[in-house]
UniProtKB/Swiss-Prot annotation:
It is found in: Cytoplasm. One of its GO terms (biological process) is DNA recombination. Its cofactor is Mg(2+). It comes from the Bacteria. Keywords: Cytoplasm, DNA damage, DNA recombination, DNA repair, DNA-binding, Endonuclease, Hydrolase, Magnesium, Metal-binding, Nuclease. One of its GO terms (molecular function) is DNA binding. It catalyses: Endonucleolytic cleavage at a junction such as a reciprocal single-stranded crossover between two homologous DNA duplexes (Holliday junction). It comes from Cupriavidus taiwanensis (strain DSM 17343 / BCRC 17206 / CCUG 44338 / CIP 107171 / LMG 19424 / R1) (Ralstonia taiwanensis (strain LMG 19424)). This is Crossover junction endodeoxyribonuclease RuvC.
Length: 181
């Protein structure tokens, strides 16, 4: 399965393409799509849309994974990030890709094993997991991290959380990290 990971941003959007075969992950490509900071917002969103569409055509992924928007201290920044993310999702869906969404916490836990990992730690682990000769830039590393997150079960924690009410009704509980009943 070929997975395209996206780290959305209005100035710089990272992308990363990996291939999953069994338990092995293989690096295919990564990079960034940059918009002109002097252009108006619609032009910048079109640049992002066109770039995502081109990456999708070039690498022919089977699915895409994208980082969810976090609520920033500055509401204007959050709105702009949401618009960039929307343009990216439109580019992916326009290519016919199923799109999966993950939080930064899910990405960090999947890649580093620690939800408060910093960008440098994510870059280092992405480099090691994909056996890259050098570290990708932070935006590309985050995009590769989202792809790795999806490849390694994606929203397993969310699925388990959805099962929790049924398990509690059946008398099951978690003790020392194990499900007991």
């Amino acid at each position: 399965m070929r997975i395209l990971g996206i780290d959305p941003g209005l100035r710089t959007t990272g992308f990363g393409v990996i291939e999953k075969q069994g338990n092995k992950l293989a690096y295919i490509a990564s990079g960034t799509i940059k918009s002109d900071g002097n252009a108006n917002l619609p032009e910048r969103l079109k640049t992002l849309y066109d770039g995502i569409s081109e990456v999708s055509r070039t690498y022919a992924p089977d699915c895409a994974a994208i980082e969810k928007v976090f609520v920033n201290v500055n509401p204007q920044s959050t709105l702009l990030l949401g618009q960039a993310r929307g343009a990216a999702i439109c580019g992916l869906v326009g290519y016919g890709l199923p799109v999966f969404e993950y939080t930064a916490l899910q990405l960090k836990v999947a890649v580093v094993g620690y939800g408060r990992a910093n960008k440098a730690q994510v870059q280092e682990m992405v480099t090691r997991l994909l056996m890259l000769p050098g570290q990708p830039g932070s935006d590309a590393a985050d995009a590769l991290g989202v792809a790795i997150c999806h490849a390694n079960g994606g929203d397993t924690l969310g699925t388990l959380a959805g099962l929790a009410p049924d398990l509690v009704r059946k008398g099951m509980r978690v003790r020392r990290g194990r499900l007991v009943g």
